[in-house]
Regions:
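Acidic, Ser/Pro/Thr-rich low-complexity regulatory regions
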Residues: 1-154
Length: 154
């Protein structure tokens, strides 16, 4: 273990957890995790450009939250090893995996290279993080394909 997590790190994680419990944030997370299954960059851009829809607000809220959390790690305010524990940042990997295959196109079409940049840096920043991202990407891709197929009739 390079740097041992401190009580300050633990308090920061608990504050991040409290932010995730806020009522509107729960709705936003629920939408992103369960209902939002983009099949391509245009599906993401449709929501990103549907200002001021509820889905647009939720996408910005979830993305902004995880970008903020990742920036704390990138700037040394939060211990990376602690942050990478599945119960703390597992959701971050999942939301990144949903847009990861389309990120280059999304960034180009929005003319914004910073979209998901901090999240991506943390997810690619260590061997442990890269292994998790690889695993989550695979799982999300299987789920995405299942979501795209019409339900079979019995």
């Amino acid at each position: 273990m390079a740097n041992k997590a401190t009580p300050h790190d633990a308090n920061l994680v608990l504050k991040l957890y409290d932010l995730r419990r806020e009522a509107e944030m729960r709705k936003a997370r629920n939408w992103y995790m369960i209902e939002f299954w983009p099949q391509n960059a245009d599906d993401v851009l449709k929501v990103a450009n549907s200002f001021p829809s509820q889905e647009n607000a939720w996408m910005r809220q979830v993305g902004g939250y995880w970008d903020m959390a990742a920036s704390l790690v990138l700037h040394g305010a939060l211990n990376e090893e602690l942050f990478l524990q599945p119960g703390i940042s597992g959701e971050m990997f999942f939301i990144l995996a949903k847009v990861h295959p389309f990120l280059k196109e999304i960034r180009a079409k929005l003319n914004n290279p910073d979209v998901f940049a901090n999240i991506e840096k943390v997810a690619a920043g260590s061997k442990l993080a890269r292994k998790r991202l690889e695993r989550v990407l695979k799982n999300v891709e299987q789920r995405r394909k299942a979501q795209a197929k019409p339900a079979k009739k019995r």
